Amino acid sequence: MQTVMMDDIQSTDSIAEKDNHSNNESNFTWKAFREQVEKHFSKIERLHQVLGTDGDNSSLFELFTTAMNAQLHEMEQCQKKLEDDCQQRIDSIRFLVSSLKLTDDTSSLKIESPLIQCLNRLSMVEGQYMAQYDQKLSTIKEMYHKLESYCNRLGSPFVLPDFENSFLSDVSDAFTESLRGRINEAEKEIDARLEVINSFEEEILGLWSELGVEPADVPQYEQLLESHTNRPNDVYVTQELIDQLCKQKEVFSAEKEKRSDHLKSIQSEVSNLWNKLQVSPNEQSQFGDSSNINQENISLWETELEKLHQLKKEHLPIFLEDCRQQILQLWDSLFYSEEQRKSFTPMYEDIITEQVLTAHENYIKQLEAEVSANKSFLSLINRYASLIEGKKELEASSNDASRLTQRGRRDPGLLLREEKIRKRLSRELPKVQSLLIPEITAWEERNGRTFLFYDEPLLKICQEATQPKSLYRSASAAANRPKTATTTDSVNRTPSQRGRVAVPSTPSVRSASRAMTSPRTPLPRVKNTQNPSRSISAEPPSATSTANRRHPTANRIDINARLNSASRSRSANMIRQGANGSDSNMSSSPVSGNSNTPFNKFPNSVSRNTHFESKSPHPNYSRTPHETYSKASSKNVPLSPPKQRVVNEHALNIMSEKLQRTNLKEQTPEMDIENSSQNLPFSPMKISPIRASPVKTIPSSPSPTTNIFSAPLNNITNCTPMEDEWGEEGF
């Protein structure tokens, strides 16, 4: 036991020596205590030997341990308290630095030994920061109390900042400036509300004066007047006070407006009665003030109105005639029909009574209410009516053939005005008609009757005008027509293709293995010196230059030579008339000559008689031994269009009859003209050579169809070379 005790003492001694070696090198108290303890232990051991006891010193060691533990605990508590105080000072310093928004570094603040000196040093630093904090906090509190008084005067909408959460944790210069800004804002709000209150009070006092209100009639008159003249500095300017004054102002303003309207209605009625009764202006000017709205002035006007009503009963015919004139004007503005006008029977009665006049006046009010309710709709109707009137004037002026040739003083701006009216109609009339359709529909649904425009339903007129007109024959009409050698699809043509004429052609025999290729670019035009009539060779033009022209051979024939000259000339002239016509609405039609062979399609070229320029190349047709090409031509075909214009439909009928007289029994495949305006090139005769539908091929072996061409051409031996539009030689 003694050995363990000594070991504990030695271990404690070693720990103490390690902890206090640097600070207590000159302190020998613990060594002296240890020496005394060792002496005591040596004496105790000798006494145990002398006494012969077992050497039990447990009670002594227990007392010694208890004393040491008590001392150790006391010192540990003291250390902990000093450390807590130091940490509290550090936290306080950091809070003050944060509240002051300083840039000082507080991370170096630590608890160091010795603790008493560390605590003293931290307390000194805390005092320095606390002085700055207290100074700024006192300034902020003064500003806060001032702001609090302002907020009390302004009322609940103007809320104070939170005292605990706002500036106690922030006493920086930025927060001070923000608080000062709030004070300035409150002062401005007080001034603004004072101005509003003063304005309301002045207006209320003015309204009382205009309405003739006496102080005895209004309980708060004296209080309001005293507040307006002698207002204290700390008066409350809450929003409730402003709302109360605003309500009072609205009440008296409504009373003023009511009296003003009543007075104006009386004055208007009195003025109308004065004019109808022919009261002299001097008597009118001598009457009371027209702008005063007090009760006395209104009573004077009411008395005058009663007198005039008595005179009105004595002059009913004058008033009845005036009412009927007003009704006629309202009828015109509402575009009433005759049936609607006749529905008001008092208009056509000869009885003149006060009840009839009252019925007229009530009907006028009804019509005026209808005009007011349909103001926007009627303005659109008037716009449409003005356009229709301009259209009628334009038609009347255009139908007058002598407007430009009449003698005497002429109108040089007539054509310019007509053109302006025409442009205005084309620009605005469709737009107005499209806008009228939903408006008229809604009007008819509201009123339960049809809106008539000069006894005609305007909705039907607008719907018919806005629907696209069919400029061409419908598909059903085309299906019911008897089939001829060729058919032309002109329904879907563009306006630029309406003047083109489609020429029927014989079915070309095309190789099944070779499809139609894209058109080739035509060669430059070369004057045809051999034949003045433009014919088409039996073969399409080649891609070579004009230097490599083809030479005539025995097996190439000129089909045009076999045609009747007279029939060729007539058909060519009709084709030229249809092609060179200036009517853009002409539809394409098939053309045929008076011969045994129907015309083939013309190759693409540039016409001399049109202002169009073909940009499409010449189509490249595949040839077979039995394929022939022909063109309606004559020896003396004029290059300029004839003076007489042939209508396309008329030419269609004539040439269809000629085609039937040829007794062609073969089944000619139907042709469709290409619908696309971009893929449809121009030809000299305004004929499109491009097919839209697949072309039926004719077999190369002899057939009843090919016999038509081979029968009359067996003994032809002399063939003359010809040139087409591109300078290519043909036969």
UniProtKB/Swiss-Prot annotation:
Keywords: Cell cycle, Cell division, Cytoplasm, Cytoskeleton, Microtubule, Mitosis, Phosphoprotein
Low complexity compositional bias, start-end: 560-596
Positions carrying Phosphoserine: S537
Region entry Disordered, spans: 472-642
Gene3D superfamilies in alphabetical order: 1.20.58.1520
One GO process term, biological-process aspect: meiotic spindle elongation
Tagged with keyword Nucleus: no
Family listed: Belongs to the MAP65/ASE1 family.
Protein name in UniProt: Anaphase spindle elongation protein 1
